[in-house]
């Protein structure tokens, strides 16, 4: 059955479907439809609004506002560790970068330069570094926060597929995280270069950043933005940097090689909690 679902994902019009879902999720009227969508989603995924800034399911202007809801200020305290988790979810993989490649799933690897959609020379900087991959399920908080303090120097929006990024698909689709549409964000930090990659997926209706707004799926070419040292926005560890409009994955790539992991692959993790002690 899993193989059938993957074949279906490959043949459906992924970007059209994602854009259509995005339009539906952005509807504020009729109110009964908006509330029905939110209510059905809450029931299906057992959503807990007690930690949200707004705990009234009917108060959100549209489904997107509900899905990208903010948490209460005290819901995710910031860890004292040097590195914190960038998102709520499951730590699907983490470890050292070996032979310029990362682990996607057991028996499957993909190259750093493929993930970044850049040159081998650009990826060479991270050859001795570390990586961590966090899968965000539909029930998770879908804002992404800085794993460490840093200065944004470049972003690269990469068009691609929109396969689901659940465990079954990641296990079976070769190079999935380097094939899906994604936003690659490069930062300079006190611990060297850091890349935060926001990976799109089936029915993900867009990726947004706090500095550039929303990127809709279906771009026809790579789009790159570069900031000078004087113009580059800076972010503190734990500060919000972006969000997903429906599910996905965050891949963290570091030049630093000395991360002392606090969690094992498969562990549920919370944003702003300690990633490396």
Predicted regions and their residues:
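Contiguous, well-folded functional domains in the mature portion of proteins
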Residues: 1-277
């Amino acid at each position: 059955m899993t193989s059938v679902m993957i074949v279906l994902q490959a043949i459906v019009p992924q970007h059209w479907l994602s854009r259509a879902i995005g339009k539906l999720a952005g509807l504020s009227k009729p109110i009964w439809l908006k509330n029905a969508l939110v209510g059905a989603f809450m029931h299906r995924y057992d959503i807990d609004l007690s930690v949200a800034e707004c705990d009234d399911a009917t108060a959100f202007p549209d489904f997107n506002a509900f899905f990208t809801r903010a948490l209460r200020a005290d819901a995710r305290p910031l860890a004292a560790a040097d590195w914190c988790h960038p998102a709520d979810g499951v730590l699907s993989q983490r470890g050292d970068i070996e032979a310029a490649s990362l682990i996607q799933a057991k028996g499957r690897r993909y190259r750093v330069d493929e993930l970044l959609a850049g040159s081998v020379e650009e990826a060479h900087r991270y050859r001795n570094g570390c990586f961590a991959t966090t899968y965000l399920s539909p029930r998770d908080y879908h804002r992404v926060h800085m794993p460490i303090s840093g200065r944004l120097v470049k972003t690269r929006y990469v068009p691609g597929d929109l396969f689901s990024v659940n465990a079954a698909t990641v296990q079976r689709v070769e190079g999935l995280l380097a094939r899906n549409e994604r936003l690659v964000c490069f930062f300079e930090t006190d611990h060297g270069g850091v890349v935060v990659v926001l990976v799109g997926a089936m029915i993900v209706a867009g990726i947004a950043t706090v500095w550039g707004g929303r990127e809709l799926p279906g771009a026809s070419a790579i789009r790159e933005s570069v900031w000078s040292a004087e113009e580059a926005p800076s972010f503190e560890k734990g500060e919000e940097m972006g969000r997903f409009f429906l599910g996905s994955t965050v891949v963290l790539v570091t030049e630093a090689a000395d991360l002392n992991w606090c969690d094992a692959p498969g562990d549920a993790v919370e944003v702003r909690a300690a990633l490396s002690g």
